[in-house]
Amino acid sequence: MGAALALLGDLVASVSEAAAATGFSVAEIAAGEAAAAIEVQIASLATVEGITSTSEAIAAIGLTPQTYAVIAGAPGAIAGFAALIQTVSGISSLAQVGYRFFSDWDHKVSTVGLYQQSGMALELFNPDEYYDILFPGVNTFVNNIQYLDPRHWGPSLFATISQALWHVIRDDIPSITSQELQRRTERFFRDSLARFLEETTWTIVNAPINFYNYIQQYYSDLSPIRPSMVRQVAEREGTRVHFGHTYSIDDADSIEEVTQRMDLRNQQSVHSGEFIEKTIAPGGANQRTAPQWMLPLLLGLYGTVTPALEAYEDGPNQKKRRVSRGSSQKAKGTRASAKTTNKRRSRSSRS
């Protein structure tokens, strides 16, 4: 590479001397324009004056053979020097890569450009609190030094406070305002819906539940005993039995007592289309009132459902009865003994 730089210095000096002697610029000599112009002049001298010798024509123009040789050979020399520089630089880069490769041949993962390129698959994991983990409190100290200049702590403190205030005005206040507006809108909607449910007139509609009431009545009227038992009692007593009644055979002497229905108390039924009467708060305080069946709904809209209301609405929690191990083992023992007795009886009957 040093020899190439030396040749470049000699070439630049020769081209500069030729440019000073002929009046052409270095760019024209390097591009070959000066050599083309001189050849045109030599051709014109050979045509007009009949000079056929190149040396005589060069002398007639006022150039020396050395200067003409430099001007004519400068473009080719520059092109060859460029190729030489490219070759030398390519060899040097290959040598550098080979040196790095063979010096780090034991590494299985290439680390070339790992720390310069952010899009690599492998990167060093350095979280923001990395140095604060190693040295607790260093981030706070660095931030204070960065934000407050000890030499000009007054202006820097004012600038820091103004920036923090501007950050709050620009970013925090709009978000807080939108959240508060959302809360107030939701609260207003719930309050309006609750007051609408309180002030509206409610009407009883039994049509959707008549079908379920009929099914409930049907299953409640079914006999709690098997029809075969009823037939046996009827055959014994000589009485005809109609199914679809509620029977009770506890301490029964005849089929009439078995087929006797239970007397149900007549309850006042509420008919469809009747309006629910509104009640006014006593004492003249004009407090808000609501029926008891609507209270869980209204409190749920306001988000104040108490455990007592949850138990009233969902019913008490029924816990499973635990069975002791002793009783279960006794039950298993009795079942096993019953099975063995049955087996013995069957064997004796076969024999």
From Swiss-Prot:
Q: Which GO terms describe its biological process?
A: monoatomic ion transmembrane transport; symbiont entry into host cell via permeabilization of host membrane; viral penetration into host nucleus; virion attachment to host cell
Per UniProt, the keywords (alphabetical) are: Capsid protein, DNA-binding, Host endoplasmic reticulum, Host membrane, Host nucleus, Host-virus interaction, Ion channel, Ion transport, Late protein, Lipoprotein, Membrane, Myristate, Transmembrane, Transmembrane helix, Transport, Viral attachment to host cell, Viral ion channel, Viral penetration into host cytoplasm, Viral penetration into host nucleus, Viral penetration via permeabilization of host membrane, Viral release from host cell, Virion, Virus entry into host cell
Q: Does the keyword DNA-binding apply?
A: yes
GO terms for CC? Answer: host cell; host cell endoplasmic reticulum membrane; host cell nucleus; membrane; viral capsid
Q: What is the effect of changing S103D?
A: In strain: Dunlop
Renumbered to this chain, region (D1) spans: 272-307
Q: Where is this region: Disordered?
A: 312-351
Q: Where is the lipid attached (N-myristoyl glycine)?
A: G2
The superkingdom of the source organism is Viruses
Q: Which InterPro entries match?
A: Polyoma_coat_VP2
What is the residue range of the motif Nuclear localization signal? 315-323
Show the stretches that span the lipid bilayer. 289-309
GO MF entries: channel activity; DNA binding; structural molecule activity
Q: Coiled coil: which residue ranges?
A: none
Basic residues: compositionally biased ranges:
341-351
The ranges of region (DNA-binding) come to 312-351
| Other observations noted | The strain Dunlop sequence is shown.
Q: Which family does it belong to?
A: Belongs to the polyomaviruses capsid protein VP2 family.
| Name of the protein | Minor capsid protein VP2
